[in-house]
């Protein structure tokens, strides 16, 4: 598609160029299995409707827009690909400048979380039909930052770091959200780590809310997947292909079968089962209240079935009596065991992480290599949150940034590149390692 710009269709040569460019791209891309629809442009209808600098353009230019995106391009596409759906703009209600930012028709872009600095809970105020763009920034992985900085540059307000940040006051926004949710990071590496955790939590909050409202909302696509240079951005995979926390989280919140928790006032937790498969599934869910040593203070279980391509709300669980008076000392965990063999785990804190009495976790792991398969068995003496496993070799793990809340080992795997000999260097961090706390006084 085209991006936030419009030309006068003054000559037949320009019209022919647009048609040929459209046909060329359609022929090049139409075979891709991931192709869902063709979209004419990004945000041009919306911009024309209410952005400054667009909405005072001439009626003639507006007619040229309609000719280009609602006649020339769809006709050219149809000649090359007559089976894939065409959508004139995003967001849009279907074209012709008819309420392109409607919450009730078509697709919607939403940026009050991030640009508007609204809390993550603000997603739950909206029930769009399809949220096709929303996002949250984080810094790239530390090894990526090392490629464009010297040690003296490794401060987010250094000239080099700011030159690798193209969204105005974005670094200040990241610090704002840290202040709302976490204790201040103790060093540069911890700040990078916390920024990625924030990004993952933000997008998870939106996707799971909209998935719980399947039927009203039929899709959520976050901005963005990857980068074209090493930079702080909304991407979940950085320039060198290194996965941020968000990319690991997306494996869970976009899973075909997902268990999630809706948290309501007065400590009411409602489990939901979302099923995007063509078969009925069932799920057994256990909701726990645990203290920060991992001891179970309360648990309750239930089972539900969910039809294909649907969502099922389960019985709400009121935990007010269990939690009241010790909100800083306990957390809620839900474990969904699905009939397809997968498991969903959810952890919710009664208060922001910065106010929770999280204990210092001692995490150990056993590493084993068989051929190119690397297996890690991780254990923690107390609950450890957002556990990040890193290596001197670039690896994609089967899971990462997970919570270790039980006494049993948690296994993750990765495939080592053929060129790697022996055992790579591995290190682990969790949330409690990101700030300075005197645990001896706990």
Task: Cite the ranges covered by each PLM segment.
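Aromatic-lined substrate-binding rim segments of carbohydrate-active enzymes
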Residues: 1-17, 83, 100-117
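Active-site neighborhood of glycoside hydrolase catalytic domains
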Residues: 8-97, 201, 240-241
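Substrate-binding clefts and catalytic carboxylate motifs of secreted carbohydrate-active enzymes
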Residues: 38, 75-78, 87-100, 105, ...
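Long, low-complexity ectodomains and other extracytoplasmic segments of secretory-pathway proteins
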Residues: 239, 252-260, 343-366
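Short edge beta-strand/loop segments characteristic of extracellular beta-sandwich folds
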Residues: 270-276, 375-381, 415
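Short acidic, flexible loop segments centered on an aromatic residue
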Residues: 277-295, 379-397
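Intrinsically disordered, low-complexity Pro/Gly/Ser/Thr-rich segments with frequent PxxP/GP/PP motifs
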Residues: 288-326, 394-420
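Terminal connector regions
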Residues: 315-359, 417-442
